[in-house]
From Swiss-Prot:
Reactions the enzyme catalyzes: [(1->4)-alpha-D-glucosyl](n) + ADP-alpha-D-glucose = [(1->4)-alpha-D-glucosyl](n+1) + ADP + H(+)
A single Gene Ontology CC term: chloroplast
UniProt gene name: SS3
Chain intervals with Polar residues compositional bias: 54-63
Keyword Transit peptide listed: yes
CDD domains in UniProt: GT5_Glycogen_synthase_DULL1-like
Subcellular location: Plastid, Chloroplast; Plastid, Amyloplast
Entry protein name: Starch synthase 3, chloroplastic/amyloplastic
Keyword annotations of the record: Amyloplast, Chloroplast, Coiled coil, Glycosyltransferase, Plastid, Starch biosynthesis, Transferase, Transit peptide
UniProt lineage: Eukaryota, Viridiplantae, Streptophyta, Embryophyta, Tracheophyta
Organism superkingdom: Eukaryota
EC number: 2.4.1.21
Length: 1042
């Protein structure tokens, strides 16, 4: 009740003050405020004939806070008007003096009332606090707050009884605290003595609007604390945010801060870019000016001989009318036909230029007979041509001929000296050359501008196409799981709800009466922990999917989930141990980067022998582009192509294995590479493979690489080793290095080709945490191998990709016309013509079959030979590029090349060597690329072919089966991968199998050109880069660390 009256008094006072300070009327100053005092109100009302009782009522209501001021104010204003009208002689100064006296009295009365109410409130506050102090003291509680119910965005007082505290002997007592579990707005205040007995101290604090809890301790400003027996003091705050609201508030604050920092960073980058642009522009101007000076000097030097030879006429040979002319004038140049070798020519032509032919042939004009009447016919046969003197000409240069350019046979060139005429009215020479320099400079600048515009447009388009491809691939990656799980919306947004739809019919939970969803975020590490198990409900349609909905937090970057048959467990579908993970966009948190270290003995382009080198470089780049950290440890061969290594510098050295090992660091294709250079000469052999002690060399390297990581303080999340050559990393690490602080590191091992080093591969399979090979189908084909069969639970097939920057028809310097899927027909037509011209094939519209391969039995050489003859029978052209490591096979193909050159020289060409530029042209110019491998772990040829719009014709094996979907037979299989059919394939390893695919392909080219062109466009738009494989490898890396 006390609190009620206290608040009521305060509101009354507030209302009274508001009324008293309201806007004045248009009457004289002072009269509008007389209503606030009761006695003044009475006198005014009596003058207007009103009852005393009304006046008394008005005054009483005013004191009690019942506001009737607006009506009283109107009355006063009316009276003011009457007084002025009746007396009409009042002096304004008298009125103002009276007004001031009334104002002062009103203000004094208000102040007195306010002080009285303030005193009453303070007394009531003190009584309440004293009561609380006594109650807490009686209970032995040394601390309390006032008011007892603490609300956000208000002030409170904190009281401490020093006598009951561990600070009872301390002269100074301070409070130190913060809000919301010590996470928001820390504070420190000094406590002061109060009027309450028993040594109560207090201070005033403001509660922020975001607070749900206040946490604090007391201390003496140094090292003595009262922290509530190590539990800290806390006060709950009512009526504001709860913990979840505050967490979301923090996330929103962080998001705003990130946006602000991003804008600031973008502005800094813009300024840096502008600075770079200005510096580059300045350098370009200086370079162009220097080039213009040099070019001008060169022209000046070249012109001097012509100036020395130049004359105004040659007696009885030629002359010019008028004789005094300047640049851009039209003159007549006369020539005596009888003066030289053109006496008997039917036609005369002038082929000319200027300034010693600076612009080459720029004047071509036919002469006509002058028919001069005053000239003796015996002395000459004069002809003339009207010539416009070129602008800027100092000298005119010419010869005479019996026909136009490319049609003349006989010339008069002044005895091989050419004819040169001075321009009489020319600019002063220095001024002319200054103008010439400026003209050259302006042209260089314009050429540079146009070139930069083309390059900029091309770069922007390349970046746009790359981003669109990556976005499209991610969407297809998500949709490819739709037969098992997908979400609505497909793109999961942080801060929004998402519905997860699951089809148990296609999983281990098929037929189970219930399906339960278990999820979390950020790879099961989210601060809120896992979501409670949710029973999934049937969808509204008749499908076998079930669904549930979850709210995605603002700080999520990944959604994680598994499914089970019961709330408390039972059978789980966890995607074979990988769990289901879907990316979240728009969150304020980013996925912490993994640190991956590849230990390998091949790397493109510095030391590449086979596909392993491509994978190491391309996979590393793709993972790095996803914002993870990648290093590569590599032998420093003496045969490395150093021109591809940037910023190579000595890093350190260490001793191991009885020798010093020097470490160098450089960048290859934007990747961080550590080169190990043991001083025992193991890698100074001039080759990567081929030494009798290869196993020992690479075993030493693997151990040295692990020692380097240990001594260098590296703590990678993943060590990725490849094939037999770096397989020892797996067991050496587990045997010797896990106890040295590398306990969190996991081993991933990739098999590129099981043909070599089976024993080492088998041992690596045992020790690796996860193992992969280069395609799902090859993984199935080798699953029965004894070195793999015992480890299928950790063995995965992930298709390789290609590097879209290396294989890019839009930015390929080896093809005549850059192209994308938008102009694939025109681009490939130009490439085919160039290919035919370069190889001496007939330039005609033939279907071209390209074969780019190593000539080994694995690649199906007997099928290649058959395909060559079949293509020629179908009136096609064949281009083969490749060589054989086996001399017998090489000689066999040399004989075949000679035979084809004799019998089909205009339609077949075998280039039996490796030629990188030619391979690009074949991919671009061929209609089909044939890959008839007997087995193929992955295969890159068919992927590159599709990148260039060439349709693959392949045998169904390994990675060829995983990437090529037959246009007639694989529509459903392609649809499951969210792809369109993209080629022709066959099963057998014999001639009928090749014929079945090749004949259908060539017939499609002949019979349905428009459909075939659309197929070329389709295959170009499919993404066979590392975008998707990189995502799958990251899932594998995280699974290894789980």
């Amino acid at each position: 009740m006390i609190s009620y009256f206290l608040n009521q008094d305060f509101s009354r006072k507030k209302q009274g003050r508001m009324a008293a300070s309201g806007p004045k009327s248009s009457g004289p100053r002072g009269f509008g405020r007389r209503t606030t005092v009761g006695s003044a109100q009475k006198r005014t009302q009596k003058k207007n004939g009103e009852k005393d009782s009304n006046a008394t009522s008005t005054a009483t209501n005013e004191v009690s806070g019942i506001s009737k001021l607006p009506a009283a104010k109107v009355d006063v204003q009316k009276q003011s008007s009457v007084v002025l009208n009746e007396r009409n002689v009042l002096d304004r100064s008298d009125i103002e003096d009276g007004s001031d006296r009334l104002d002062k009295k009103t203000t004094d009365d208000d102040d007195l009332l306010e002080q009285k109410l303030k005193l009453e409130r303070e007394n009531l506050r003190r009584k309440e606090i004293e009561t609380l102090a006594a109650e807490n003291l009686a209970r032995g509680d040394r601390m309390f707050v006032y008011p007892v119910i603490v609300k956000p965005d208000e002030d409170i007082e904190v009281f401490l009884n020093r006598n009951l505290s561990t600070l009872n002997n301390e002269p100074d007592v301070l409070i130190m605290g913060a809000f919301n579990e010590w996470r928001w707005k820390s504070f420190t205040r000094r406590l002061e003595k109060t009027w309450i007995h028993e040594d109560w101290l207090s201070c005033l604090l403001h509660i922020p609007k975001e607070a749900y809890k206040m946490d604090f301790v007391f201390f003496n400003g140094q090292s003595v604390y009262d922290n509530n027996d190590s539990k800290d003091f806390c006060v709950e705050i009512k009526g504001g945010m709860d913990k979840v609201d505050f967490e979301n508030f923090l996330l929103e604050e962080k998001l705003r801060e990130q946006e602000k920092l991003a804008k600031e960073e973008a502005e800094r980058e813009r300024q840096k870019e502008e600075k770079r642009r200005i510096e580059a522009q300045k350098a370009a101007i200086e370079a162009d000016r220097a080039q213009a000076k040099a070019e001008t000097q060169k022209r000046r030097e070249l012109l001097q001989p012509a100036i020395k030879k130049a004359v105004v006429s040659a007696e009885n040979v030629w002359y010019i009318e008028p004789s005094d002319f300047k640049a851009e004038d039209t003159v007549k140049l006369y020539y005596n036909k009888r003066s030289g070798p053109l006496t008997n020519s039917k036609e005369l032509w002038l082929h000319g230029g200027f300034n010693n032919w600076v612009d080459g042939l720029s004047i071509v004009v036919k002469l006509v007979n002058a028919e001069l009447k005053d000239v003796d016919p015996k002395s000459g046969n004069w002809w003339f041509a009207e010539v416009v003197v070129p602008g800027g000409a100092l000298v005119i240069d010419w010869v005479f001929a019996d026909g136009p350019p490319k049609g003349a046979f006989l010339y008069d060139n002044n005895g091989y000296q050419d004819f040169h005429a001075l321009v009489p009215q020319k600019l002063p020479e220095e001024l002319y050359w200054l103008e010439e320099e400026n003209m050259i400079f302006r042209k260089l600048q314009e050429d540079r501008r146009l070139k930069e515009e083309v390059m900029r447009a091309k770069m922007e388009k390349t970046a746009r196409l790359k981003a669109e491809t990556k976005e499209r691939t991610l969407k297809k990656f998500l949709l490819s799981q739709k037969d098992v799980v997908y979400t609505e919306p497909l793109e999961i947004q942080a801060g929004n709800p998402v519905t997860v739809l699951y089809n148990p019919a296609n999983t281990v939970l098929n037929g189970k009466p219930e399906v339960w969803f278990r999820g979390s975020f950020n790879r099961w590490t989210h601060r809120l922990g896992p979501l409670p198990p949710q029973k999934m409900e049937a969808t509204d349609d008749e499908s076998s999917h079930v669904k549930t909905t979850a709210k995605v937090p603002l700080d999520a970057y990944m959604m994680d989930f598994v499914f089970s048959e019961k709330e408390d467990g039972g059978i789980f579908d966890n995607k074979n141990g990988l769990d289901y993970h879907l990316p979240v966009v728009g969150g304020i948190s980013k996925e912490p980067p993994l640190h991956i270290v590849h230990i390998a003995v091949e790397m493109a382009p510095i030391a590449k022998v086979g596909g392993l080198g491509d994978v190491v470089t391309s996979l590393s780049r793709a993972v790095q582009e996803l914002n993870h950290n990648v290093d590569i440890v590599f032998p420093k061969y003496d045969c490395i192509k150093h021109n591809f290594v940037k910023d190579l510098q000595f890093n350190r050295s260490y001793h191991w294995g009885g020798t010093e090992i020097k470490v160098w660091h450089g960048k290859v294709e934007g990747l961080s590479v550590y080169f190990l250079d043991p001083q025992n000469g193991l890698f100074q052999r001039g080759c990567v493979y081929g030494c009798a002690d290869d196993a020992g060399r690479f075993g030493f390297f693997c151990h040295a690489a692990l020692e380097f990581l240990l001594q260098g303080g590296f703590h990678p999340d993943i060590l990725h080793c490849h094939d037999w050559s770096s397989a020892p990393v797996s067991w050496l690490f587990k045997d010797h290095y896990t106890q040295y602080g590398l306990i969190k590191t996991r081993i991933v091992f990739t098999i590129h080709n099981l043909e070599f080093g089976a024993n080492a591969i088998g041992k690596a399979m045992t020790f690796a945490d996860k193992a992969t090979t280069v395609s799902p189908t090859y993984a199935k084909e080798v699953a029965g191998n004894s070195v793999i069969s015992a480890h299928l639970y950790k063995f995965h097939g992930i298709i390789n990709g290609i590097d879209p920057d290396i294989w890019d028809p839009y930015n390929d310097n080896f093809i005549p016309v850059p192209y994308t899927s938008e102009n694939v027909v025109e681009g490939k037509r130009a490439a085919k013509e160039e290919l035919q011209n370069r190889l001496g094939l007939k330039s005609a519209d033939f279907p071209v079959v390209g074969i780019i391969t190593r000539l080994t039995h694995q690649k199906g050489i007997h099928l290649i030979k058959h395909a060559i003859w079949r293509t020629l029978e179908r009136n096609g052209q064949v281009v083969l590029l490749g060589s054989a490591p086996d001399p017998r096979i090489q000689n066999d193909f040399v004989n075949l090349a000679n035979q084809l050159h004799s019998s089909h020289g205009d339609r077949a060409r075998l280039v039996l060597t490796y030629d990188e530029p030619l391979s690009h042209l074949i991919y671009a110019g061929a209609d089909f690329i044939l890959v008839p491998s007997i087995f193929e772990p992955c295969g890159l040829t068919q992927l590159i072919a599709m990148r260039y719009g060439a349709v693959p014709v392949v045998r169904k094996t390994g990675g060829l089966f995983d990437t090529v979907f037959d246009v007639d037979h694989d529509k459903e299989r392609a649809q499951a991968q969210v792809l369109e059919p993209n080629g022709f394939s066959f099963d057998g390893a014999d001639a009928p199998g090749v014929d079945y695919a090749l004949n259908r392909a060539i017939s499609a080219w002949y019979d349905g050109r428009e459909w075939f062109n659309s197929l070329c466009k389709t295959v170009m738009e499919q993404d066979w880069s590392w975008n998707r494989p990189a995502l799958e490898y990251l899932e594998l890396y995280h699974s290894a660390r789980k």
